[in-house]
């Protein structure tokens, strides 16, 4: 096996990267009918596995879970989750041969072993599903030619897939068919029915490709979604402590600040987030964001280049083979940081507006990171719709995990692949921010309100125009029109 993307010629690579079509709601008029009466077996019962399965069952589909024998014998967490929710659970040999659609929702690093174990058991002409294409694109897994290979990738953690479905809604979703494995031409019909069963069609579905999903997903999670939040949390907390702020206050401002700030981002993009600031603070946040972009532009491009070339996956898979030595080392180091061990501050009251007023630097980091990630993806050939979902859209969902249990929770919820990429980015970004940005800060940038200053109307007009006319704001306004039912995400109520 070898990296699938690297076997394609340039024309094919550009074609796959540029696959992105926003599907009309009418295209889902048949709902789940294509999969009605067919046996669907999910491998793995983690967050995505369980919650997708619950939604699909509630949509009228026949769902069972295939687990490894030891998971069943030892009654591990995956077995307990599936059993307690009333699903049929069995070993691979028992369930896989009966399945019309096998969905592999195990962690990325297990995919090759899982596919090797189950492919001989999959019946002729059945389908194999993924929710992330790393195994196909980066590992280069070759699937039997009679098997249809599809992907349905909800753009949020598994818990949110379930919560939005229970509200009668769904989460934005990417679907794709692997061009090397669509022998009967049924791949798109399978993917559409699967997406409808999870509720994704109610929030907007992009018809994409395995390649575009993988390359954009890796870029988003490494940079703005996880890496920037981790680097920003560590640097901002250390700055607050250096300025003599109460550790409990500093910890709470950072822990809940990302969530509060990005809630505005979710509802109205960067424009609304910046509008939550006073005019003086907005001008300062804009200036800081431009400084941050200048200092981190090379790092965003390096991550994108390493993702496109396959270098990132090569290095990560070397770490897999080495027992996750680097991943575990970086995870341990994160657990020992000052921010992670800050007092909880349960008795400290911070109003919603105070998170903005005292978090101007954090707002600037969000703006810079979102725009850099989006721009870098688009420059690489990824369509704006995909770049939006993999940067701005998912950010409030990840910020919500930090609000629950800080960086520990974020790194538990995201995949090992995302966690590894997060550390690669944050370990470089944090020292740059500490050296190049923190010394330039002024009173009111972090931990206290920006002093009121005389406002130049022309400057304010130009800054507002620059914010609102950025391409991510234009495509975001269009895509958010499909998500008018979005609920507020908040750990604080």
Swiss-Prot record:
NADP(+) binds at residues 45-48, 68, 76, 78, 108-110, 158. Residues 14-208 form the KARI N-terminal Rossmann domain. Its cofactor is Mg(2+). The active site is at 132. It catalyses: (2R)-2,3-dihydroxy-3-methylbutanoate + NADP(+) = (2S)-2-acetolactate + NADPH + H(+); (2R,3R)-2,3-dihydroxy-3-methylpentanoate + NADP(+) = (S)-2-ethyl-2-hydroxy-3-oxobutanoate + NADPH + H(+). Pfam families: KARI_C, KARI_N. Residues 209-345, 346-486 form the KARI C-terminal knotted domain. One of its GO terms (biological process) is L-valine biosynthetic process. Mg(2+) 1 binds at residues 217, 221. Keywords: Amino-acid biosynthesis, Branched-chain amino acid biosynthesis, Magnesium, Metal-binding, NADP, Oxidoreductase, Repeat. Its EC number is 1.1.1.86. One of its GO terms (molecular function) is ketol-acid reductoisomerase activity. One of its GO terms (cellular component) is cytosol. Signal peptide: none annotated. Mg(2+) 2 binds at residues 217, 390, 394. PROSITE patterns: KARI_C, KARI_N. Pathway: Amino-acid biosynthesis; L-isoleucine biosynthesis; L-isoleucine from 2-oxobutanoate: step 2/4; Amino-acid biosynthesis; L-valine biosynthesis; L-valine from pyruvate: step 2/4. Substrate binds at residue 415. Binds 2 magnesium ions per subunit. Belongs to the ketol-acid reductoisomerase family. HAMAP family: IlvC (MF_00435). PANTHER family: KETOL-ACID REDUCTOISOMERASE, MITOCHONDRIAL (PTHR21371:SF1). Involved in the biosynthesis of branched-chain amino acids (BCAA). Catalyzes an alkyl-migration followed by a ketol-acid reduction of (S)-2-acetolactate (S2AL) to yield (R)-2,3-dihydroxy-isovalerate. In the isomerase reaction, S2AL is rearranged via a Mg-dependent methyl migration to produce 3-hydroxy-3-methyl-2-ketobutyrate (HMKB). In the reductase reaction, this 2-ketoacid undergoes a metal-dependent reduction by NADPH to yield (R)-2,3-dihydroxy-isovalerate. This is Ketol-acid reductoisomerase (NADP(+)). The gene is ilvC.
